[in-house]
Amino acid sequence: MKYTAKPLPPVTLPELRQVGKPLRRVDALGKCTGSTVYAGDIFLPNMLHGKVFHSSIPHGRIVRLDVSKARALPGVACVITAAELPQSVLVTDMPGQTGQKRRAGSDAHILAGTMVRFIGDPISLVAAETQATAEQALQLIEVEYEAFPAVYDPLEALQPGAPVVSTPDNVVARWKIRKGNLQEGMAQADLVVENTFTVPFVERAYIEPEAGVAWIDERNVVNIRICTQVVEHFRSIALALNIPQNRLHIQGTMVGGGFGGKEDITVETFLGLLTLHTQRPVRIEYSREESIQAHSKRHPFIITHRTGVTREVRITAAEIKMVANSGAYVYLSPYVLLYATATATGPYRVDNVRVDSVAVATNNPFTSAFRGFGTPHASCICQAMPSCRRQALCARCCWSGLQSSWRSLRKTWILPTARCL
């Protein structure tokens, strides 16, 4: 089939203020000269250095935690465990979780008091006069675990008898889409194509690790300057610190890379707790190793696409199953899963659709927002499936790939989620 491109008619644009003109970024000068202040650049007088003690096993019960040697080390201002916290659950009340209600078993803990669920779970906080002293104090913390079986594969985590990461069944979120009649749609197809795809964990590796400072001002307000993408977390942080919201002020600094990884609470709560306990300014900056161990990743997905297609390359039906690996805690998994579900069929008209998606807790690092927020998982698969269908149809009908591509083009239509494309 021959296709000749037609020239587009000339378009006269109105005079625009920005489009088509050079724009000077307001932050360009500071970044080019190195004068921009990031969270890790802030040092305060009389400041303590904070460190976090993390779990070294993926799943187990804390049998004994002894921080007495760390507390006795000269230069250590305080050591905090879950026993000293007013409440240890960092509530993440996310809509979209199973039953549309928060499942407490999937909430993250500020500090693990009895159970650890992944390598990197925070157990204790240390504040000391110097960074070296704080690191030495971490080495003096003694912990004994009763190790439990761990589960890393979300499909295994769904099986009866699997290790329980999130009670009662490891499911932290479900979504579904129903449109038309799937059986009738498949019966209309000349060919049914089924494929299973996997999307792996992805690490952001942003240049700036998690960092911030906290202090108490003359009004008795806890101030936190932090590299964050969401300052609105102050409500949850105030709850964790057991102080009124008007006693907490969070100021975001320039973010040296976030990509969704700094949408969650990172070290804000740790800073607030250490500052309240010591009544002194505290600074925390993760090392690269700590950052990679402690922050979230992009969700791994297992996606099975089963689609029916006619010889004219019209999709008659689509059955899609998605399993997302939530890791140890829920965080933004319900929202990420929602967007992946809503875009599961891509930009194609499909009149008969069944989509089932589930996010599953495992003993992996927790997963959360990453650029695209679930949509890339669905999009990359949606663009792989047409290629699979074309290959199958070309083999059966002796069409070229180009011909089958043109046959699949359509004008404006309504997507299964009632959006107009």
Could you say what each language-model-derived stretch is?
Residues 1-171, 192-195, 277:
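Flexible, low-hydrophobicity surface segments
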Residues 6-16, 133-155, 175, 232, ...:
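Gly/Pro-rich active-site capping loops and adjacent beta-alpha segments
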Residues 34, 78-82, 118, 193-195, ...:
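General beta-strand structural signal in soluble alpha/beta enzymes
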Residues 39-48, 207-210, 352-365:
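Flexible hinge/switch segments at interdomain interfaces of large molecular machines
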Residues 52-86, 123-144, 211-278, 332-346, ...:
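Alpha-helical support elements that line or immediately flank enzyme active sites
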Residues 96-98, 187-202, 284-291, 333:
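Short Pro/Gly-enriched beta-strand edge/turn motifs at strand-loop
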Residues 113-115, 244-252, 276-287, 291-294:
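Conserved catalytic cysteine-centered active-site region
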Residues 159-241, 384, 392:
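Helix-loop-helix junctions that connect adjacent transmembrane helices in secondary transporters/permeases
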